[in-house]
């Protein structure tokens, strides 16, 4: 079920009503009905769409609450300064789960997300469970039907479980099983968060991955080269971040908190090798769970990631 954006989420400190250099995002955001959006001749500006769904988390036996994530992130983002002075910043609202099957919600979200991807230079998709990634893939493939897609996931988990239905832990297996013209790179894998069968599947499917331990103090030149080569080798990049990759000291409000997770600045350093490329079709950030957040710490962290990713 699709609902348009809520203007009352977008509030913040007012420093000036006339000087754009003192504006914050709540002063520049606009709201549109994405279901009625027509394709523009030239993509421009930024589109934001929320995936207010945690059904996939429940199916994956995780702790629910991530469906409240998109609104919490938007509220935290609203008060940040508009340093980039975006051409346009549009909040398209959220998609909610009201279908019998999760896959139908994912398809509904994909149809709408594809419109944003086609119309904007940047599209941010805010979760919600990491089943958003499969919906993001469907949207990407709709916009780019023949191009090679490189999927980059900053995550503690492979999310390649073999299940009978779509869950927050199956997205990337679904993508790889359905599409031979995609490849998968995972950054931040937790050795204690994935079974041997998932490592075996990664070997079978030639999934590239980097352990969280390898990213402890810095992003080494070989890892930077790996990321840049992966971007270079594909026509389109689908970029996604699962917030459970970040240590729970910084991101307590997630579905599955990390005890040996990455530092936020490491995630930013990794993203610097990805975001600047014009090949990046969209960015999704998943598993922000306000139910378990402390002082809105995780919501603010996601908001600041989006803020840093604006270009």
UniProtKB/Swiss-Prot annotation:
Coiled coil stretches, renumbered: none
Entry cofactors: Mn(2+)
Reactions catalysed: N-formimidoyl-L-glutamate + H2O = formamide + L-glutamate
Keyword Repeat: no
Entry binding sites for Mn(2+) 2: 155, 157, 242, 244
EC assignment: 3.5.3.8
Cofactor note text: Binds 2 manganese ions per subunit.
Record's keyword terms, sorted: Histidine metabolism, Hydrolase, Manganese, Metal-binding
UniProt-listed GO biological process terms: L-histidine catabolic process to glutamate and formamide; L-histidine catabolic process to glutamate and formate; putrescine biosynthetic process from arginine, via agmatine
Pathway this chain belongs to: Amino-acid degradation; L-histidine degradation into L-glutamate; L-glutamate from N-formimidoyl-L-glutamate (hydrolase route): step 1/1
GO MF entry, a single one: manganese ion binding
InterPro entries (alphabetical): HutG (IPR005923), Ureohydrolase (IPR006035), Ureohydrolase_dom_sf (IPR023696)
Stored Gene3D superfamilies: Ureohydrolase domain
UniProt superkingdom: Bacteria
Similarity annotation: Belongs to the arginase family.
General function of this protein: Catalyzes the conversion of N-formimidoyl-L-glutamate to L-glutamate and formamide.
Name assigned to this protein: Formimidoylglutamase
Organism for this UniProt entry: Staphylococcus aureus (strain MSSA476)
Taxonomic path: Bacteria, Bacillati, Bacillota, Bacilli, Bacillales
Gene it is expressed from: hutG
